[in-house]
Amino acid sequence: VLNGGGTPVGVVSSEKRANLLREMGCEHVIDRRERDYKFWKDEHTQDEAEWRRLGKDIRSLIGRDVDTVFEHPGRSTFGASVFAAARGGKIVTCAATSGYMIEYDNRHLWMKLKSIVSSHFANYKEAWAANQLVCDGKIQPLLSKTFSLEQTGEAALAVHKNQIEGK
């Protein structure tokens, strides 16, 4: 985002991750747990007031809504992500570690001309360009832990439990 001229706002689930983003150059970071967002009142009912609070917190940092939201957790945060995107903005979904049966208020999508797109990283040309950024030292990939092939189950469980940063 920084290399593309954008203003990133990182929304994370711990102070450790907030510090990691700051070390990587992200000036605007919100720790969901510190702010105690409760996007769900119960397992069936989302809390739009909490979405509004997140949007207000984002606007207090950068003065506007965000153009693009990279949505990773899935069920637990998707409604808030749809709400937080600016009019005409995009929500890019690239995973669903908190659940893949997604719910959101569609009025916040269609009434504000937002779109949802999916991504599974990149096509070959985009992957080459991303690798070139690494080779040129413009971005630093984050690898928090490595696993052997025999530890695939353990690795998947660590992702599910939100214990991994980066890839």
Question: Model-found features: residue ranges?
Answer:
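Adenosine-nucleotide cofactor-binding segment
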Residues: 3-76
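Glycine/Thr-rich phosphate-binding loops of Rossmann-like dinucleotide-binding domains
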Residues: 39, 78-79, 101-102
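Active-site loop of short-chain dehydrogenase/reductase
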Residues: 65, 87-91, 165
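C-terminal hydrophobic helical "lid"/dimerization subdomain
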Residues: 79, 124-167
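Conserved helix-to-beta-strand junction in the class I
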Residues: 83-85
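Rossmann-fold dehydrogenase core element
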Residues: 87-94, 104-143
